[in-house]
Amino acid sequence: MLPARTEFQYPGTTMLQQLVPAEMLLVKLLRIWRLARTGRVPEAAWISALRAWDLPDTLDYHFDMLCHAVVTGNRRPLAVCGLGCCQIAEDEGRLLRVMAMLQHHRQAEAATALDAWLFPPAARRAESHMQALALGMSLAELVIPLMPMQLLTRGGWTPTHGQTLIRLAASPLRH
């Protein structure tokens, strides 16, 4: 078992191509969700992207509520890259880090990281929705490593999933 690493951050130079599928899914979903909130893409875009992975429909709700908590409760302006960006932003890395902690049963560390990231009411809301999302993704074998770029068996990765991400990255949603 790895030691506690609540201070861990994804390096600012982390590239999307270095992420495992579960990490890439969350980063792309967050980016598409943010674009939908600004009216630049249809609301259904992020829901379609999530459902392309054959995850339970209830995760739509949990992801949406999680994003609302992160946007409204962030201690600083939200740092999320554009859909076509090849690097991950600070808040994208924070989301991945907390999700990894929850998937690896490190709830206390996840709560500490959320408290440092979000104001307390938003952190509590985000945590409950993240737990549901973490469980749903784990059941679908979409697991985020505790440390980025950790060598994993890429459970859940199929050409269909890869093609979906490629289509998302190359689609008109980038602009």
Regions from the language model: what does each represent?
Residues 1-175:
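Polar/charged low-complexity regulatory segments
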